[in-house]
């Protein structure tokens, strides 16, 4: 399946699930392909054919963008290594959940969460350790007794009760023996996958944008490589999607940044190096770099940006 066709399917799934989806854009390389929102759930999605093709750099951008937009990052693909992604299974790439379109459909449309996660050595499940301990104690079984029944050590049983995952085979034996479920489903919409290879501890290496003076005004700057916007600015619990460059380059992206900010319910700004005024294109504040340098603090910038939910009115000064 081509990546464009896969992106169409992902978009259709999210719309079917009641999500509002951002417009398609052609920027390459890109750290994400679309943003989708449904009430309080925001998902930042990267669509690929092969999930191993997602670089650590792209994963870092995807994770940073999702975190600052108040959403969850998600990779959707077809294959991992030489095999197709299993339906109902979750994979992890650089600390980010990766699933197939079918698993996405099951979770978002059918409300059926996945139970299985892929890890070196095969497919595993999470055990509800408290439930397992309660079942064991109800039968007055020691750790060793249950270990003998399942063919594992007492230490392994102790680890299961402390939250360690296990193989499908062992999980089935546990549920058959106690005649009840102990396997926990995986909530894709939570930001807490097992981050053994998480990129979040690494320093971002985005392109340079000369916004050091904004940091001096108390704003935080996060530069990005593969997004329609070059940076995310944060100030006083506000996030600003920020583009930067000459007018010919940036104005083309202003409408897209506006669309993304509307879905994410965040501010949008384009800083233009060869422009000396300010105006609004959609929801995006287009402002000259020289004009931006004249602001006195972050609150003045927020005043220029206006309310997130307000209808933009043309302004040029």
Curated annotation (Swiss-Prot):
Q: Which InterPro entries match?
A: Arc_TR_HTH, Cro/C1-type_HTH, Lambda_DNA-bd_dom_sf
Q: Which residues bind DNA?
A: 143-162
Q: Which UniProt key words apply to this protein?
A: DNA-binding, Transcription, Transcription regulation
Q: Which residues form the signal peptide?
A: none
Could you name the domain of life of the organism this protein comes from? Archaea
- Gene Ontology molecular function: DNA binding; DNA-binding transcription factor activity
> Boundaries of each HTH cro/C1-type domain copy?
132-185
User: What HAMAP family does this protein's entry cite?
Assistant: HTH_type_cro_C1
**NCBIfam families in UniProt:** PRK04140.1 (NF003162)
Protein name as it appears in the record = Putative HTH-type transcriptional regulatory protein Mboo_0195
Q: Which organism is it from?
A: Methanoregula boonei (strain DSM 21154 / JCM 14090 / 6A8)
Task: Show the taxonomic lineage.
Answer: Archaea, Methanobacteriati, Methanobacteriota, Stenosarchaea group, Methanomicrobia
